[in-house]
Regions:
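Conserved beta-strand positions that form and line the central face of beta-propeller blades
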Residues: 12, 115, 146
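Residues in and immediately flanking transmembrane alpha helices
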Residues: 27-28, 79, 136
Length: 154
């Protein structure tokens, strides 16, 4: 799927767990966002996508939970963030981009959400953490202090 996504210039390639080097090269050439589901790999005991290789090749990476009762009963985005650093070997900054702006871009909504900018909907999480590294490597703790959706605290 990754190679075809690059060949046809898809916005994104979804559910990537296994992705050969040819697929990575094709996505890089086609400007395709690779959508990765680390909690699915974790739950299934499957391999983890070669995210570091993708980023090194210039492929934008997005990450999500893929919550479903069969292959991924995980709703926890902080766990996805943890896995992004620990299993994908991405930096905290790369992971933050993957779960925000690149995720929005993968569903063609980067003009509305994914970053804090004037004119966007105002979705934001305030973390109880001294820095971004703490969020990425503190596994098993809910560090979300405040969640703001469309400018309103929820």
């Amino acid at each position: 799927g990754s190679q075809l996504a690059g060949e046809i210039g898809a916005i994104s390639a979804e559910h990537l767990i296994v992705c050969p080097p040819e697929g990575i090269a094709s996505m890089a050439k086609g400007g395709v966002i690779a959508c990765l589901l680390p909690a699915t790999s974790f739950n299934l005991g499957a391999v983890f996508a070669p995210a570091r290789d993708m980023v090194n090749a210039g492929v934008p990476v997005a990450m999500a939970t893929d919550f479903n009762p069969g292959s991924c009963p995980c709703l926890n985005m902080q766990f996805v963030i943890n896995l992004g650093c620990l299993k994908y070997k991405l930096t905290p900054e790369e992971v933050l981009t993957a779960v925000t702006l690149n995720g929005a871009a993968a569903i063609d909504l980067a003009d509305k959400v994914g970053s804090v900018e004037e004119g966007k909907l105002g979705d934001l999480v305030i973390w109880d953490a001294p820095d971004l590294d703490y969020i990425c490597y503190r596994v098993g703790s809910n560090l979300a202090k405040t969640v703001i959706k469309r400018g309103e605290i929820v």
